[in-house]
């Protein structure tokens, strides 16, 4: 692992080299902007076009949504060992994150006024889970579990499908 030391004489140049690796090229930025503009203009038809181009998936507008039944079926079709592993991971993530949730509190200040904080869940949460060739099941577990324990009433998950137009069953089960 490469380290940077503030005490080093070449710290500024080393930092510049390090930061340049995170820069997004103008070409990539322009390409993404054009795709987003097209999707805003043409909606689901544009999404289907890019799914074919990037993922090789032939999708039709109106067929993007995966229903609760398909998610439950995907979980049931998994081998028992994988279901158990997902369940254990979910329990660990939930246990950890429940401990990290902030708690409401109130107190009286020196003037006798009641002060405090109240934490309410975000009403609507969207989570993106990288999918396609290599679905990131861990991302689905981490983000969906946290949104649930935070009691977000509406959680929408977005993920690309494979070339067959299907979402990986492991990923669906993790949601």
Indicate residue ranges for each PLM-predicted region:
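N-terminal Rossmann-like NAD(P)+-binding subdomain of aldehyde/semialdehyde dehydrogenases
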Residues: 1-123
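Conserved small-residue-rich beta-alpha loop and adjacent elements
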Residues: 107-173
């Amino acid at each position: 692992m490469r380290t940077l030391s503030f005490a080093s004489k070449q710290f500024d140049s080393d930092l510049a080299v390090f930061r340049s690796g995170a820069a997004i090229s103008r070409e990539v930025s322009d390409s993404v902007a054009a795709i987003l503009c097209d999707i805003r203009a043409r909606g689901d038809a544009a999404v289907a076009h890019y799914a074919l181009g990037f993922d090789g998936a032939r999708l039709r507008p109106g067929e993007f949504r995966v229903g609760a039944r398909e998610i439950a079926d995907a979980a049931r079709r998994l081998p028992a060992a994988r279901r158990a592993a997902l369940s254990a991971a979910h329990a660990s993530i939930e246990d950890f994150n429940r401990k990290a949730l902030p708690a409401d509190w109130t107190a009286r200040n020196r003037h006798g006024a009641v002060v405090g904080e109240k934490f309410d869940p975000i009403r609507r949460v969207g989570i993106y889970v990288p999918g396609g060739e290599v679905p990131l099941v861990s991302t689905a577990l981490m983000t969906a579990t946290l949104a649930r324990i935070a009691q977000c009433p509406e959680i929408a998950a977005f993920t690309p499908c494979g070339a067959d137009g299907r979402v990986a069953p492991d990923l669906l089960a993790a949601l």
